[in-house]
């Protein structure tokens, strides 16, 4: 009786918003999610499961990707103690759709540099955006410095309308409504690096080599871009890692060489600190040294292991199909909230890759016994040296990358596994003839 009374008292303490929450997978009630859109940047964009979209019937699902809500009573007397402060309202990933609070007016076009095959698609896309949709198009300054674009007189009138920016110098985070990438997976990673806070929706066209993260084909770009502008598109929120590198104070020359003079430099008790948003992975390796790397890995302040080998990869589910997959990690769907820890050629027969909850904080430091320094890179960029006393703190960022889907998050992912990585491709075994089966 006392336990039941305590449970009733705790239930009454829940706020009205908390009490109104129902899991659509368990209760079949979609009204709550329709009336409570997940908001993005103010006055620009949002995600919702709005039934007003033209293709609503195409994306409604009978089951949530989150799975059913667990029953929290166990046997006749036991139950889980309810804590109102830990209740989270999370929308079903299968129902996330892009919608606009106001019509989009500006678009950032990211083109793979020094690729002549992309010049014609780039020109066609920009002309369509400017002349047909009256969009303000942003491009990186070095894109317009391409000799093929400079020498094209027919493209001159359009080129004058571009808004240009320079990486690491100009902040365009509040000017861009959505992003279009032309190239391979690297263009999407580059787009992520440009936005260290909220990221505009990204539409990625497969015009590169691999294209696991770029699901759109360019042949029908006009109709596909129109759907995005109209707000009729499925979206997958690709989680990113928030990485903070804290370094012991050293001479000024070394600090600048290590990239610490860039935007984001901070001081922390006399130490130097930088923060990055990472879409794929953080890689800590032994660099040019011939010795094994020797780094300690902490989880929420507790030492869990010491990595002795070529290094360690800390990746998002999106990054699980990149370097981590080559190192033997499992491929994890981007909607799974998790962080992967994968050793690189460990000098151990029992060091297997692990998956930890998305909410933990990992901290990586050189072991006191380490014979050499280590090197760290973030999505293959900003590579720098890590010495004794330096630390790398990693947790899930609150700023995901909203990637626009062709169909839906599940279908697109398995399509990429099949088409790009040729997952489980094998010649099928032939069946026995009927006469052999009878014998």
Swiss-Prot record:
Broad EC category: transferase
InterPro entries associated with the record: ATP-NAD_kinase_N (IPR017438), ATP-NAD_kinase_PpnK-typ_C (IPR017437), NAD/diacylglycerol_kinase_sf (IPR016064), NADK (IPR002504)
Highest taxon, organism lineage: Eukaryota
A GO cellular-component term linked to this record: cytosol
Catalytic activity, EC: 2.7.1.23
A biological-process GO annotation: NAD metabolic process
Phosphoserine: residues carrying this PTM: 46, 48, 50, 55, 64
Cofactors named for this entry: a divalent metal cation
UniProt name for this protein: NAD kinase
Catalytic reaction list: NAD(+) + ATP = ADP + NADP(+) + H(+)
Sorted UniProt keywords: ATP-binding, Kinase, Metal-binding, NAD, NADP, Nucleotide-binding, Phosphoprotein, Transferase
HAMAP family: NAD_kinase
Coiled coil is among the record's keywords: no
Organism: Mus musculus (Mouse)
Family classification: Belongs to the NAD kinase family.
Kinase listed as a keyword: yes
Gene Ontology molecular function: ATP binding; metal ion binding; NAD+ kinase activity
């Amino acid at each position: 009786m006392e336990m039941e009374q305590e449970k009733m008292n705790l239930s009454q303490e829940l706020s009205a918003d908390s009490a109104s929450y129902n899991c659509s997978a368990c209760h079949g009630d979609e009204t709550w999610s329709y009336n409570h859109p997940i908001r993005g940047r103010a006055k620009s964009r949002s995600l919702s499961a709005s039934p007003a979209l033209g293709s609503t019937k195409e994306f409604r699902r009978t089951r949530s990707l989150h799975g059913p809500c667990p029953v929290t009573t166990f046997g006749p007397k036991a139950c889980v103690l309810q804590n109102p402060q830990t209740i989270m309202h999370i929308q079903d990933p299968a129902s996330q759709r892009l919608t606009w609070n106001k019509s989009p007016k500006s678009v950032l076009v990211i083109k793979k540099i020094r690729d002549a095959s992309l010049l014609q698609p780039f020109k066609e896309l920009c002309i369509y955006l400017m002349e047909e949709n009256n969009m303000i198009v942003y491009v990186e300054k070095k894109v317009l410095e391409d000799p093929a674009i400079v020498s094209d007189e027919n493209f001159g009138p359009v080129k004058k309308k571009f808004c240009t920016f320079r990486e690491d110098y100009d902040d365009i985070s509040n000017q861009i409504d959505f992003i279009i990438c032309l190239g391979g997976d690297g263009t999407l990673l580059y787009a992520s690096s440009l936005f260290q806070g909220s990221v505009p929706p990204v539409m990625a066209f497969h015009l590169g080599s691999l294209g696991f993260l770029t699901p759109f084909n360019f042949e029908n770009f006009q109709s596909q871009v129109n759907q995005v502008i109209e707000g009729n598109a499925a979206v997958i929120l690709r989680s990113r890692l928030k990485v903070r590198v804290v370094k012991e104070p050293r001479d000024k020359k070394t600090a600048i060489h290590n990239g610490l003079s860039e935007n984001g430099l901070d001081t922390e008790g006399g130490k130097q600190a930088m923060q990055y948003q990472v879409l794929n992975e953080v890689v800590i390796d032994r660099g040019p040294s011939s010795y094994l790397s020797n780094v300690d890995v902490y989880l929420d302040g507790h030492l869990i292991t010491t990595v002795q080998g070529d290094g360690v990869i800390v990746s998002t589910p999106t990054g699980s199909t990149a370097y981590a997959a080559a190192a033997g990690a499992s491929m994890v769907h981007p909607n799974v909230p998790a962080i992967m820890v994968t050793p690189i050629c460990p000098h151990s027969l029992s060091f297997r890759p692990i998956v930890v909850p998305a909410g933990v904080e990992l901290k990586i430091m050189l072991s006191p016994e380490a014979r050499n320094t280590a090197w760290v890179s973030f999505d293959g960029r900003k590579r720098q040296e890590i010495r004794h006393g330096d630390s790398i703190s990693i947790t899930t960022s609150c700023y995901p990358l909203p990637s626009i889907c062709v169909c839906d998050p599940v279908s697109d992912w398995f399509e990429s596994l099949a088409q790009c990585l040729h997952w489980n491709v094998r010649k099928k075994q032939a069946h026995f003839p009927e006469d052999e089966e009878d014998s």
